[in-house]
């Protein structure tokens, strides 16, 4: 009798020439994107009373939310990428020293269309020219990048489309969220920032001017106040159609990081990638006022080619200059978006065999002299660019990503930040684990700015200083190594009630690469090296997620009351009208009789 593995190997492939030709039976591609920790999970359900090692701190009462791209169906293209998976939200509810797990897919328009068809219908990542004709005009977002609690709802976000609202307790999808009809752009960031002092949410969108797939250079920035009312909106032009994944906010300014990974409409129409890395293009930083802005108020700063990671902190000095901290890698992090064939990298860049991702500090003067230029992508629009190029004022060799801070200190000088860290000097069991899916994030790091690098409200200096400068350190480092068979996903800081900055806990998902399962680990945020105080064991393998947040349950409970039928605000109002680009497309179809 043949062994089951022999039978499986003899099955006819579902893909011919990279294209899905046989939707059933369900079989996913045999590629690294769908292997190891990235094998599809597709779990929906609840698991109560999870096994725990150690002691969950008694003062933790809330939910750790995170989201993962998780293809519901085998993709249309065999070489599909991780970022194209359907958003699945995980909620780990913690109370009274116990933990429970709930997970559900975000019921986006895309998800619902494919669920009814019983197969994938949407093609390459952010490329509608590769979709099945039956879904033309459907919002393509998979809502798989971040989940943010806002005014009683959980917003599942991906920067290629509008957010979708979910119930924070049941994870039921309520519908597309347009801020009660106030924001109707085709795209919306996955990284809004909330000002803890004012309660305002500052948010933005790129490729915002058309249908979200036309490679426009339009950038919009909005502010929504704590009462849910849009109070600021301004539109700008970027120098080229590229990715603006994250931002920072200070008390008076917004900083947008434009990465030299470029869109090209003709490439997309040929069935190619949405993005291509351009090793000859600068990295750019756009600085705009938070209040009363006009389109010409933007100032773009240029620096040498590099790839932006995520923002740690952003604040202002007494001089009015802006401090902006984020990780910046020295090459293309998104290897699945290589340069176009006609692009020749500068000498040295093509020979890099590994990337470094330090934490860099930039200081921008919003009053710097600037000039209007014209670019090929912006066409006849003015792009306001600083006359002088910029360089980081310091580079801390953390080699990490997914920076997080105590968000009570958003817009303010901050002392502490945390990252998932790559340390290639630590042992790794390749025989047991294979290639580390998602990157070798084998450590968690806690970093504390010291000396002049921590700016108090009275600081007047902006130079780089502090112990350890000679070896690329600008403060204290507290690092925990996972072991030779494990890696971490993004950490999240949980503040201790009434505690000083950085006092609290750090929570993260731990990947057991040799066992293909996950744990949730909880640390004392200022003593990572001592190891976790509690480990919550999950009885299944999740996927590599992207971002998440902790929400205190007092906030959820209070908003549930306000959002009830007899509450002072009432139930969440989800979008009732199609987006403007959808209306326009419907009109065009009517005119042509399609």
Curated annotation (Swiss-Prot):
Q: List the EC numbers from the record.
A: 1.13.11.-
Keywords from UniProt, A to Z, are: Dioxygenase, Iron, Metal-binding, Oxidoreductase
GO terms for biological process, alphabetical: carotene catabolic process
Known cofactor(s): Fe(2+)
Q: How is the cofactor bound?
A: Binds 1 Fe(2+) ion per subunit.
* Superkingdom of source: Eukaryota
Positions with a binding annotation for trans-resveratrol = 125, 158, 401
Q: What class of enzyme is it?
A: oxidoreductase
Task: Please write the reaction equations for the catalytic activity of this protein.
Answer: trans-resveratrol + O2 = 3,5-dihydroxybenzaldehyde + 4-hydroxybenzaldehyde; piceatannol + O2 = 3,5-dihydroxybenzaldehyde + 3,4-dihydroxybenzaldehyde
Gene Ontology MF terms: carotenoid dioxygenase activity; metal ion binding
Where, by residue number, does Fe cation bind?
A: 191, 245, 310, 547
Q: Output the Pfam families linked to this UniProt entry.
A: RPE65
Give residues annotated as binding piceatannol: 125, 158, 401
The family note in this entry says:
Belongs to the carotenoid oxygenase family.
Any idea what job this protein has? Dioxygenase that cleaves the interphenyl C-alpha-C-beta double bond of resveratrol to yield 3,5-dihydroxybenzaldehyde and 4-hydroxybenzaldehyde. Also cleaves piceatannol, a compound that differs from resveratrol only in the occurrence of an additional hydroxyl group, which leads to the production of 3,4-dihydroxybenzaldehyde and 3,5-hydroxybenzaldehyde.
Q: What is this protein called?
A: Resveratrol cleavage oxygenase 1
């Amino acid at each position: 009798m043949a062994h089951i593995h022999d039978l499986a190997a003899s099955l006819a492939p579902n893909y011919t020439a990279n294209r899905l030709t046989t939707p059933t039976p369900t079989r996913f591609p045999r590629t690294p994107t769908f292997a190891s920790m990235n094998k599809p999970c597709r779990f929906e359900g609840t698991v109560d009373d999870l096994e725990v090692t150690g002691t969950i701190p008694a003062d933790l009462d809330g939910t750790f939310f995170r989201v993962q791209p998780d293809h519901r169906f085998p993709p249309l293209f065999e070489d599909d990428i991780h970022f194209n998976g359907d958003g699945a939200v995980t909620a780990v509810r913690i109370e009274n020293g116990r933990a429970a797990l709930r997970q559900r897919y975000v019921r986006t328009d895309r998800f619902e269309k494919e669920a009814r068809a019983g197969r994938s219908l949407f093609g390459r990542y952010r490329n509608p020219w590769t979709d099945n004709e039956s879904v033309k005009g459907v919002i393509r977002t998979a809502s798989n990048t971040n989940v943010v609690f806002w005014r009683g709802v959980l917003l599942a976000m991906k920067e290629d489309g509008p957010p979708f609202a979910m119930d924070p307790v049941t994870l039921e999808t309520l519908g597309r969220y347009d801020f009660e009809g106030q924001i109707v752009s085709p795209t919306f960031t996955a990284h809004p920032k909330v000002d803890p002092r004012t309660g305002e949410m500052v948010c933005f969108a790129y490729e915002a001017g058309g249908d979200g797939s036309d490679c426009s250079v339009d950038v919009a920035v909005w502010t929504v106040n704590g009462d849910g009312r849009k109070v600021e909106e301004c539109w700008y032009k970027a120098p080229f159609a590229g990715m603006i994944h994250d931002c920072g906010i200070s008390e008076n300014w917004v900083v947008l990081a434009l990465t030299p990974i470029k869109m090209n409409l003709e490439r997309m129409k040929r069935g190619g990638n949405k993005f291509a890395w351009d090793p000859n293009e600068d990295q750019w930083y756009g600085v705009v006022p938070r209040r009363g802005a006009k389109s010409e108020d933007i100032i773009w700063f240029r620096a040498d080619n590099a790839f932006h990671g995520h923002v740690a902190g952003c604040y202002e000095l007494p001089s009015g200059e802006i401090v902006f901290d984020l990780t910046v890698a020295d090459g293309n992090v998104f290897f699945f978006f290589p340069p176009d064939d006609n692009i020749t990298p500068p000498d040295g860049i093509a020979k890099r065999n590994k990337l470094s991702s330090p934490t860099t500090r930039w200081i921008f003067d919003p009053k710097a002299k600037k000039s209007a230029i014209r670019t090929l992508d912006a066409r006849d629009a003015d792009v306001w660019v600083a006359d002088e190029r910029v360089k980081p004022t310091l580079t801390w060799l953390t080699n990490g990503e997914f920076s997080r801070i105590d968000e009570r200190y958003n817009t303010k000088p901050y002392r502490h930040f945390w990252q998932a860290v790559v340390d290639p000097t630590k042992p790794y069991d390749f025989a047991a684990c294979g290639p580390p899916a998602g990157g070798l994030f084998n450590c968690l790091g806690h970093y504390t700015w010291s000396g002049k690098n921590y700016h108090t409200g009275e600081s007047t200096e902006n130079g780089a200083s502090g112990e350890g400068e000679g070896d690329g350190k600008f403060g204290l480092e507290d690092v925990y190594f996972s072991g030779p068979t494990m890696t971490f996903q993004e950490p999240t800081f949980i503040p201790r009630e009434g505690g000083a900055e950085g006092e609290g806990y750090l929570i993260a998902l731990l990947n057991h690469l040799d066992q293909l399962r996950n744990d949730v680990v909880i640390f004392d945020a200022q003593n990572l090296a001592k190891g976790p105080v509690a480990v919550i064991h999950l009885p299944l393998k999740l996927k590599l997620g992207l971002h998440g947040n902790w929400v205190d349950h007092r906030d959820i409970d209070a908003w549930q009351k306000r959002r009830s039928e007899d509450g002072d605000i009432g139930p969440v109002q989800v979008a009732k009208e199609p987006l403007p680009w959808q209306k326009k497309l419907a009109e065009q179809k009517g005119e042509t009789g399609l």
